């Protein structure tokens, strides 16, 4: 991989002496200036991986190369890697300026350089007039920005962010997502971001690493992860999905509920049992008799930007999202284009 700055090779970690693994044979390459997100449910190993990369935890086996140098034995303060934690870890007895400048002062950086770097950092996070505010006077979003500024002022080659926005309300979280992406682009620093929030990962990332039970299930762009999931878990975890049992009848044709549909996926045997993934927003509703399969709307909920409806077809429930409401009890048909159906091998 061109411009690779971090390479993780065959890395494993055990959480007890019985061989139970938190991380199982992790292999990953990360590029310079990349915003990469580790995404998965609680307990999947993503925070453990961040702690190992930051030097706060040691792996059982495997290697970590940072700019081609093995750093497993390198102490955290010598790695040129900084970490922003979920709880901010700010010093409550220091003001904003002193919090941001703490690392620089520990390195005995000249005062005039410290002043200039802090000024630049405050401007970057949109808080130029907050240098001498007390930490307890700040909102949650402002505290998070200060924590990020404190990490960035050290000019790390790599910034690790462990669920930094999880304590914020929805609106503030969305605003900070935009700010973080903007800051990352301006500085050209590589970000490794940890979250269990699928929307957050899809919004911010250049690439997403989907993890579960200590292993990497899929690596790809947000578009690849959403539109081309490789496993049932990924399809179900990233957004809402309709996942049905189907049959790959022949090349570019699948069978679902007795109807044959055209598809775009290849690489399957004739008559192979497969999983079919259909996103709720891709299901088109038509008047009865005009589509592929017929069913009845059994529920409808308004969710702000669209209606989410449940459609029963041959005793299977389909989630359908549309800006147009179809009333409960109404009989309709569905219509699917070839690119609305994603075919996966059975696990």
UniProtKB/Swiss-Prot annotation:
InterPro entries assigned to the protein according to its UniProt record, in alphabetical order: AAA+_ATPase, ABC_SmlMolc_Importer, ABC_transporter-like_ATP-bd, ABC_transporter-like_CS, Mo/tungstate-bd_C_term_dom, NA-bd_OB-fold, P-loop_NTPase, PotA-like
Predominant subcellular localization, coarse grouping: membrane
Residues that hold ATP according to the record: 40-47
Q: Name one GO cellular component term.
A: ATP-binding cassette (ABC) transporter complex
Task: Please give the PROSITE patterns that the UniProt record associates with this protein.
Answer: ABC_TRANSPORTER_1, ABC_TRANSPORTER_2, POTA
What EC identifiers does the entry list?
Answer: 7.6.2.11
Top enzyme class? translocase
Cysteines engaged in disulfide bonds, as pairs: none
The reaction(s) catalysed by this protein are: ATP + H2O + polyamine-[polyamine-binding protein]Side 1 = ADP + phosphate + polyamineSide 2 + [polyamine-binding protein]Side 1
Cross-referenced Pfam families, in alphabetical order?
A: ABC_tran, TOBE_2
Q: Which UniProt keywords are given for this protein, alphabetically ordered?
A: ATP-binding, Cell inner membrane, Cell membrane, Membrane, Nucleotide-binding, Translocase, Transport
Q: Which GO terms describe its molecular function?
A: ABC-type polyamine transporter activity; ATP binding; ATP hydrolysis activity
In this chain the ABC transporter domain maps to 6-238
Top-level taxon of the source organism: Bacteria
What membrane topology was assigned to this protein in its record? Peripheral membrane protein
User: Subunit structure of this entry?
Assistant: The complex is composed of two ATP-binding proteins (PotA), two transmembrane proteins (PotB and PotC) and a solute-binding protein (PotD).
Q: Which family does it belong to?
A: Belongs to the ABC transporter superfamily. Spermidine/putrescine importer (TC 3.A.1.11.1) family.
Q: What NCBIfam families has UniProt attached to this entry?
A: potA
What is known about what this protein does?
Part of the ABC transporter complex PotABCD involved in spermidine/putrescine import. Responsible for energy coupling to the transport system.
- What PANTHER family is this protein classified in? SPERMIDINE/PUTRESCINE IMPORT ATP-BINDING PROTEIN POTA, SPERMIDINE_PUTRESCINE IMPORT ATP-BINDING PROTEIN POTA
Which protein is depicted? Answer: Spermidine/putrescine import ATP-binding protein PotA
């Amino acid at each position: 991989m061109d411009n690779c700055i971090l390479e993780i090779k065959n890395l494993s970690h055990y959480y007890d002496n019985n061989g139970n693994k938190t991380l199982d044979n992790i292999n990953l390459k990360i590029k310079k200036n990349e915003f990469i997100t580790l995404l998965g449910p609680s307990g999947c190993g993503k925070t453990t991986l961040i702690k190992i990369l930051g030097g706060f935890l040691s792996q059982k086996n495997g290697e970590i190369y940072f700019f081609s140098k093995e750093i497993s034995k390198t102490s955290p303060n010598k790695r040129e890697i900084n970490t922003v934690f979920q709880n901010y870890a700010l010093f409550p007895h220091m003001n904003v300026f002193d919090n941001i400048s703490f690392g620089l002062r520990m390195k005995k950086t000249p005062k005039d350089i410290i002043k200039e770097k802090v000024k630049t950092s405050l401007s970057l996070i949109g808080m130029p007039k907050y240098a001498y505010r007390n930490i307890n006077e700040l909102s949650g979003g402002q505290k998070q920005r200060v924590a990020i500024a404190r990490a960035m002022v050290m000019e790390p080659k790599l910034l690790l962010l462990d669920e930094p926005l999880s304590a914020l309300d929805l609106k503030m979280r969305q605003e900070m997502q935009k700010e973080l992406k903007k800051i990352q682009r301006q500085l050209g620093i590589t970000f490794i971001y940890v979250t269990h929030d699928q929307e957050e990962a899809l919004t911010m990332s250049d690439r997403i690493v989907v993890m579960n039970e200590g292993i990497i299930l899929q690596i790809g762009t947000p578009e690849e992860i959403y539109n081309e999931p490789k496993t049932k878990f990924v399809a179900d975890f990233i957004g809402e999905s309709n996942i049905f049992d189907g049959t790959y009848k022949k090349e570019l044709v699948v069978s679902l509920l007795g109807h044959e549909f055209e598809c775009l996926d290849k690489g399957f045997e004739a008559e192979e049992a497969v999983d079919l993934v259909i996103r709720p927003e891709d299901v088109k509703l038509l008047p009865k008799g005009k589509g592929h399969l017929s069913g009845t709307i059994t529920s409808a909920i308004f969710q702000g930007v669209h209606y989410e409806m449940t459609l029963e077809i041959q005793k299977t429930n389909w989630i359908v999202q549309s800006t147009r409401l179809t009333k409960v009890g109404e009989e309709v048909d569905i219509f699917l284009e070839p690119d609305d159906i994603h075919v996966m091998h059975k696990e």
